[in-house]
Amino acid sequence: MDDHKPIETPDGPAVDTPGIGARRYETPPTELPITEAEAARAAGLAHNEHLKIASGYLRGGLADGLLKHATGAISEDDGQLVKFHGMYMQDDRDIRAERTKKKLEKAYSFMIRLRIAGGVVTPKQWLILDNIATTYAGSALRATTRQTFQYHGVIKSNLKRTMAAIDSALLDTIAACGDVNRNVMAATNPAQAGAHKIALQLAKDISDTLLPKTGAWREIWLDGERVVGGEDAAEVEPVYGKTYLPRKFKTVVAVPPSNEVDIFAHDLGFIAILDKKNRVTGWNVTVGGGMGMTHGETDTFPRTADVLGFVQPEDALKAAEAVMTVQRDWGNRKNRKNARLKYTIERFGLDAFRAEVEKRIGKKLGAPKPFTFDGNGDRYGWVEGDDGRHHLTLYVPSGRIKDIEGGPQFLSGLRRIAEVHEGDFRLTGNQNVIIANVPAGKRAEIDALVDEYGLTRGASALRRNSMACVALPTCGLALAESERYLPDLLSELEESLARHGLQDEPITIRSTGCPNGCARPFISEIGLVGRGPERYHLYLGAAFDGSRLSKLYREDVTASEIKGTLDPLFAAYAKDRQPGEHFGDFVIRAGFVAKTSNGPDFHERTGPLRAA
């Protein structure tokens, strides 16, 4: 049953939810989303709602804006629409003040994100993506926290060339951003080849099923040309309609015991239920996870997903579409800060949501099946799968695939490997790269190239369990540094951990420059969330497997204070931990920080409960 506290809202009558007792929820809506722009304005819907309706299925003024060569930017409205095409308009904030002083336009560029369901690319595709990076994106690829690639620094005049190159790799950027189902993640545990294959196929099927059908992407970026034959789809969005979704929607597929996709942090998830031979017998469906919040606004919060029920393999796609369309129809289109699925479930209750999903599927969901996760990190080094193929997971700091002066030559090394590799490459949800499906006879050749380019230079347990978002200088939302700051912080904390004999202890640590939570800091044992220049909120107490949220431990900690704040906790952990106890569990059991149940409870009983 639903054990979450509902949001108190003034809108609509409340109803009792069976089994919840005194908890009361709003009555779910019965009308469909408004589809006329003027009606959307009159109803007080968010600006993005009438913008989507009037966009001509995501065209807007993008085609004309690309022809305006006097500026490196596009209009503000088109900046919202271009997200659906997989892009964000950004500028270099390091030089923003200098350019303003000189009365110059901001140094605009675009971040381009690909759609790669399950994060799998062939060596041929890798080489094309590498060439795009060296030609248009500052000789760097960035593996994201959601199993795809991003390019940064692509200027407007190179957008169509970049898109054409991506298309030549038989890839695209459709729905990589925006109010749609975004890139679908899939488990990458190489030891379970059979289960992974099924998980990957489900991810691809969901991605294809929930993909917007508009022809705007190919029309605008490729001038309507096709690399592969086929007729254009009719100009209609059979699943989304003109309004698409109220907000972003993220889907993942997990295979226990590894939770490297962080299933509880996403809107929709499928947990593989395995028999004794590691065969998939069906899926537990999870709903209502999400990380983003706004500082100082307690009606916004991160939330871990609920297990909605169990579906047979043949019903998984129906369940995915049903969950997404209920969110399409029930989600908040007036306030984008409360528009994610997590708030929809808090508003109407899990039981009502389940009933509507079952109605749309046409059958009852089964009771959830038992499952166990043992962590949300990657398995580094060589692993042999149950099919006899070999897989090498490389640690890539913050996912930044580039040649580092005096350090690993990731871009050059992986390019050289792609030239001889006979398998594929797999991106992980932790921003790392797997050289996958290597025949036993090719391992020595791969190892030699890995050594030549320094791709496996030693990294501590803490570093291997770290993540950071991009933040400054390109992200317009960043309040503080993240990717550029985390390596220095890790060096400081490594010294502290070694002093307490904890250098080999896996502890998850994640950093983001703002509370939107792209690196999922609220489900890491140590989470840093930017508040301002060199200032962070420090969160502690999340579960090592990503199933429990953290709690705010210290507000506005300066960068210079973080090590000193954590060191006494490390000392206590080294002295008083129980066998096998993880750091996040310890700080709760030892009484340093309160446990977060979920959702709105995230903002309750914050701060240290006792001195370390």
Swiss-Prot record:
The gene is cysI. Keywords: 4Fe-4S, Amino-acid biosynthesis, Cysteine biosynthesis, Heme, Iron, Iron-sulfur, Metal-binding, NADP, Oxidoreductase. The keyword Metal-binding applies. Binds 1 siroheme per subunit. GO terms for cellular component: sulfite reductase complex (NADPH). Its EC number is 1.8.1.2. This is Sulfite reductase [NADPH] hemoprotein beta-component. Residues 1-26 are annotated as: Disordered. Disulfide bonds: none annotated. It is an enzyme of class 1 (oxidoreductase). Its cofactor is siroheme; [4Fe-4S] cluster. Alpha(8)-beta(8). The alpha component is a flavoprotein, the beta component is a hemoprotein. One of its GO terms (molecular function) is metal ion binding. PROSITE patterns: NIR_SIR (PS00365). Gene3D superfamilies: Sulfite Reductase Hemoprotein, domain 1 (3.30.413.10). [4Fe-4S] cluster binds at residues 469, 475, 514, 518. Belongs to the nitrite and sulfite reductase 4Fe-4S domain family. It catalyses: hydrogen sulfide + 3 NADP(+) + 3 H2O = sulfite + 3 NADPH + 4 H(+). InterPro entries: CysI, NiRdtase/SiRdtase_haem-b_fer, Nit/Sulf_reduc_fer-like_dom_sf, NO2/SO3_Rdtase_4Fe4S_dom, NO2/SO3_Rdtase_4Fe4S_prot, NO2/SO3_Rdtase_4Fe4S_sf, NO2/SO3_Rdtase_FeS/sirohaem_BS. Component of the sulfite reductase complex that catalyzes the 6-electron reduction of sulfite to sulfide. This is one of several activities required for the biosynthesis of L-cysteine from sulfate. Pathway: Sulfur metabolism; hydrogen sulfide biosynthesis; hydrogen sulfide from sulfite (NADPH route): step 1/1. Siroheme binds at residue 518. GO terms for biological process: cysteine biosynthetic process; hydrogen sulfide biosynthetic process; sulfate assimilation. It comes from Methylorubrum extorquens (strain PA1). Pfam families: NIR_SIR, NIR_SIR_ferr.
